[in-house]
Regions:
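Extracytoplasmic/periplasmic substrate-recognition and gating elements
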Residues: 60-61, 66, 138, 162, ...
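Extracytoplasmic/periplasmic solute-binding protein
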Residues: 135-145, 150, 174-221, 264
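Hinge/lid segment of periplasmic solute-binding proteins
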Residues: 95-150, 174, 200-203, 287-289
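Conserved C-terminal helix/tail region of periplasmic/extracytoplasmic solute-binding proteins
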Residues: 160, 368-439
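Glycine-centered hinge/linker elements that transmit conformational signals in sensory
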Residues: 179-180, 218-248
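Extracytoplasmic "Venus flytrap"/periplasmic binding protein-like
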Residues: 57, 61-125, 157, 161-162, ...
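A structural signal for short loop-to-beta-strand junctions that line the ligand-binding cleft
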Residues: 81-82, 89-90, 119-157, 186-190, ...
Length: 439
C-alpha cells in the first residue's frame, strides 16, 4: 500500500489508495462500437457549450475514437467521488493552482513530456506549472490550454474624454488617480466585502514586486514573506486613498455594477469580471492595462495564470495514442478560437488568435510572453489569505504592516508544516538545487 500525501480534502479521502488502482478503471474499448473511448472531466461548467461543440466536432471526424467531455458544476467533488470508486477519467481539465500541486505530489498524473504539442505552448505558462511543483520533478504533467489576465480594467470613453494616458510606472499611476479625483470622478471601486476580491489587486501587484517562486523559497527556508511581501502590502494599502469610502461594505457584484454605471474610472480586477459588468451595461467600452507596480516599465509583467490545463491520469499509458490525438484536436487553432470566442480567455498556445477587445491594452505582454502567475495559486485555501489581506486593509494602527507580515509567515508555517519539512529535506539531499532569489 502506498499512502498518498494529504493536502486537500480530495487527497485526504484518497489517502490510503494503492498505486495499483491507477491501472484500473474504464476499459480501453467500448464493447458497443469497438471505439477507443477518451473521457475528459473539466472543471469549467460555464464553458459547457463550447465543449459540447468541440465534442460533437471531434466525434464527427474520428471513426476510431469516441470523445466524452463532462463539465460538472462541482468537478472537484465529482472527481473525488469517482476516485473513491476507482473510476478515473482519462484526462482532467483543472486550473494551475494548489489542487494541481497536490495531484502532482500524490503521483496521480502521467508524465507527458513526449507530447509534441508542448513545443507550441508559451514558455511562461510551462514555467508556471514547474513552479507549482512542491519539489523539482522530472517530466511534464500538464499542457496549459487557456489562461486569464488580471490588472486594471478602465472605462475607455471616460479616459478618452479627459485625455488621460495609460500609466507605465507606479508614480504615473498615482498621478493619474489624482487627476481623476481632481475631475470629480472616483478612480477606483472595490468590492472588499467579498474577501476573495482582495486577492485581485494583491496578485496584480505581487507579480511585479515579488519573485514568482517566493513561496517555494519560503518553503526551502531561503526567504521570508515579511521581506518579500512588504512592498506589495504597502502598495495595496495605498490604493484605499483612491477608492470609495468603506470598500468593505460593498461586494463583487456591487463593484461590477458601480464600474458599469460609470461610478469609477477604473476597476482592479481580472478579465473574468467583464461578462458581469457587461450584463449591467452591454455597451460599455472597456479596455485594460497591466498594473504598473514597478518604477521601470520594462520590469512590469502581466498577471496571468493557467486557468485551464489538461493532465492525463496515471495508468492511462495504454490509451496514450488516442489521448494525444484528442489533445492535438483541442489545440488546433480553430478549436482554440472557438473557446476564446465563447469565454474571452487568453490562449496558452503560441499563434495569431483574435482576443477580446478588453484585452487590447495587455496584448503586448501576451504576445511578448511577459507574464507571471497569481501568487494565490500557491496558497493553501485553509490559510484564508484573502481574509488576512482584508483585515490588514481595515487595520489603521501604526503597526498594521508588521503585524500582517509577521502573521503571514506564522500562518504559512502553521498550514504548511509537513510540506516545509518535505521541501527542506529534499534540498538537504540536493543542496546544489537550493532556491534563492527567484531562481
Amino acid at each position: 500500500m502506498k499512502t498518498f500525501k494529504k493536502a486537500t480534502s480530495i487527497l485526504l479521502i484518497l489517502g490510503m489508495m494503492a498505486t495499483a488502482v491507477f491501472m484500473t478503471g474504464c476499459s480501453t474499448k467500448d464493447p458497443a462500437n469497438g471505439k477507443t473511448v477518451v473521457e475528459i472531466v473539466q472543471y469549467k461548467p460555464e464553458a459547457v457549450k463550447a465543449f459540447e461543440a468541440l465534442e460533437a466536432k471531434f466525434n464527427a471526424t474520428h471513426d476510431d475514437i469516441e470523445l466524452v467531455i463532462d463539465s460538472p458544476n462541482d468537478a472537484m467533488t465529482v472527481l473525488k467521488t469517482r476516485f473513491i470508486r476507482e473510476d478515473y477519467p482519462d484526462i482532467i481539465g483543472i486550473g494551475g493552482d494548489i489542487n494541481y500541486s497536490n495531484f502532482l505530489d500524490a503521483d496521480m498524473l502521467m508524465d507527458i513530456s513526449d507530447y509534441e504539442g508542448l513545443k507550441d505552448i508559451k514558455e511562461s505558462y510551462l514555467k508556471t506549472d514547474k513552479e507549482l511543483e512542491f519539489v523539482p520533478m522530472e517530466g511534464i504533467y500538464a499542457v496549459p490550454y487557456m489562461a486569464n489576465a488580471a490588472g486594471i480594467l478602465y472605462n475607455k470613453d471616460i479616459f478618452e474624454e479627459h485625455g488621460w494616458t495609460i500609466p507605465e510606472t507606479l508614480d504615473e499611476f498615482y498621478k493619474l488617480c489624482e487627476e481623476i479625483q481632481a475631475a470629480g470622478i472616483l478612480p477606483l471601486y472595490f468590492g472588499f466585502k467579498d474577501t476573495w476580491t482582495c486577492l485581485a489587486p494583491w496578485n496584480a501587484i505581487a507579480v511585479d514586486l515579488a519573485d514568482s517562486d517566493i513561496c517555494a523559497q519560503v518553503n526551502a527556508g531561503t526567504a521570508q514573506f515579511k521581506d518579500a511581501y512588504r512592498p506589495v502590502a504597502e502598495v495595496i494599502k495605498s490604493l484605499l486613498a483612491y477608492a470609495q469610502p468603506d470598500p468593505y461594505a460593498y461586494g463583487y457584484n456591487d463593484a461590477c455594477t458601480a464600474f458599469a454605471r460609470g461610478e469609477s474610472a477604473m476597476f482592479v480586477i481580472g478579465s473574468y469580471a467583464v461578462p458581469q459588468i457587461k450584463s449591467v451595461n452591454p455597451d460599455m467600452n472597456i479596455d485594460s492595462f497591466v498594473f504598473p507596480a514597478c518604477d521601470d516599465p520594462e520590469q512590469n509583467v502581466l498577471n496571468s495564470g493557467n486557468d485551464l490545463q489538461w493532465s492525463v491520469m496515471a495508468g492511462k499509458e495504454d490509451k496514450k495514442e488516442a489521448i494525444y490525438e484528442v489533445l492535438n484536436f483541442l489545440y488546433e487553432d480553430e478549436n482554440i478560437q472557438t473557446y476564446l470566442d465563447d469565454q474571452s480567455a487568453v490562449p496558452c498556445k503560441k499563434g495569431d488568435f483574435q482576443l477580446p477587445p478588453m484585452l487590447d491594452g495587455m496584448k503586448p505582454y501576451i504576445e511578448g510572453d511577459r507574464m507571471a502567475d497569481y501568487q494565490d495559486h500557491h496558497y493553501p485555501s485553509e490559510m484564508a489569505v484573502d481574509a488576512m489581506i482584508q483585515t490588514y486593509l481595515m487595520d489603521d494602527s501604526a503597526n498594521s504592516l508588521d503585524t500582517f507580515l509577521e502573521k503571514f509567515d506564522t500562518e504559512w508555517i502553521r498550514y504548511n508544516r509537513d510540506l516545509i519539512a518535505k521541501v527542506q529535506k529534499y534540498y538537504e539531499e540536493h543542496p546544489n538545487e537550493l532556491l534563492e532569489g527567484g531562481e
